[in-house]
Amino acid sequence: ELAAVVHGTTIATNAVLERKGARCGLITTRGFRDILELGRRTRPNNYGMTGSFEPLIDRELRLEVSERLDARGRILLPLDEDEVRTALKTLHELGAEAVVIHFLHAYANPVHEQRAAEIARTNWPTGFISISSDILREVREFERGSTAAVNAYVQPVLSSYLSRISDRLQEAGFGHDLLVMQGNGGTLTAPAAARQPVQTVMSGPAAGAVAAAHIGQQSGFDNLIACDMGGTSFDVSVIVGATPSLSAEKDL
């Protein structure tokens, strides 16, 4: 009898790499709709006007509302709830399947994001709502916003996939939790993965690195270069002292 099923998947990773995710909308602080394009100082090419970066959310689907917090989380301008409702209606009419709520300085105080999410839960038909302060409660609005955008982009795809897998396991008589690999090499339950699918991005290669470290150690090799090749990408990990290397950031 199976006690656990741990599933490593490239569904979320492939959706991002192949640009086959959901059509998403963004509701953000007035004046900051272009933060996903502005990003940081890094550019595709350092010189000239060549190179491009196409955010996962089209500009027409990035809408602004009135609200503002300072860096300490103090309210400077209250959230305009009517503007949130109007933005949700507009995004739905434009065909958005998932929505991101991303306000400036929400890492310090998520009150406006939480209130906007409450409004969205009664006005957004699909239920796919990504709140940036829930996904990545850290300083730096670009990193927080882009991570939340990835979450929304892959959520409908991964949720549907995990639902099918869970149903098949139940039909087969499996009564325990389905565990899904995370990009950090750990696991989370299928419902948690459906809520925050961004945690599963690069989980397939991460699982490969963990497995390679284990197999290498069992075989007497603590220092390895592990390669993971599939139909979409070729991933390489360096394992030193039987331990995979870790990073707090990932660019795709």
What are these model-derived regions, one by one?
Residues E1-L252:
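N-terminally biased helix-coil "hinge/interface" segments that flank
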